[in-house]
């Protein structure tokens, strides 16, 4: 199931391990541009390739923009969390693939991520206790077949899935969190 070009849960593509990108081709560059546009058009701060049906390790993130003139998302190819704190803190997160709800989950409050950019440069991203920190982890989870539901405790998950089903029945679209 899709809305606005975004794959919606429980589509099985969101549960797949994504392939490593071996070469940065013009097709990968074009896909990254498409993802940036889709992320912006749907009001997201992050988008992973499986969320548009592409099962490869490609992510776009921009937690800082205020309008399209300031819009310059990061493109992360084959991102890997190389360090993370043991200290977990609660974060409220939403997902373009799970519209209409937000969930409070616990995540490490500090991560270091390594990924390649579109010029094949290895870039190191470090984030602590902010939206960027959550977004990095959330989008990397997508590349390994996990959604925000997997971060929830069992009873929280049951409640969140019910809220999501109700939101879909009301016609929730990507970018809506309540």
Where on the chain are the PLM-derived regions?
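Positively charged
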Residues: 1-178
């Amino acid at each position: 199931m899709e809305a606005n070009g975004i794959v919606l849960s429980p589509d099985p593509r969101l549960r797949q391990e994504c392939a490593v990108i071996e070469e940065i081709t013009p097709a990968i560059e074009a896909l990254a541009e498409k993802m940036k546009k889709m992320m912006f058009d749907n009001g997201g701060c992050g988008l992973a390739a499986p969320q548009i049906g592409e099962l490869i390790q490609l992510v776009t993130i921009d937690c800082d923009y205020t309008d399209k003139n300031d819009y310059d998302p990061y493109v992360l190819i084959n991102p890997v969390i190389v360090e993370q704190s043991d200290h977990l803190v609660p974060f409220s997160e939403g997902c373009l693939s799970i519209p209409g709800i937000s969930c409070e989950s616990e995540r490490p409050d500090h991560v270091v991520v390594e990924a390649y950019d579109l010029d094949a440069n290895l870039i190191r991203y470090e984030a602590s206790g902010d939206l960027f920190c959550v977004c990095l982890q959330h989008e990397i989870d997508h590349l390994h077949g996990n959604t925000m539901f997997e971060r929830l405790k069992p009873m929280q998950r049951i409640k969140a899935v019910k809220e999501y089903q109700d939101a879909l029945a009301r016609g929730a679209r990507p970018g809506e969190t309540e």
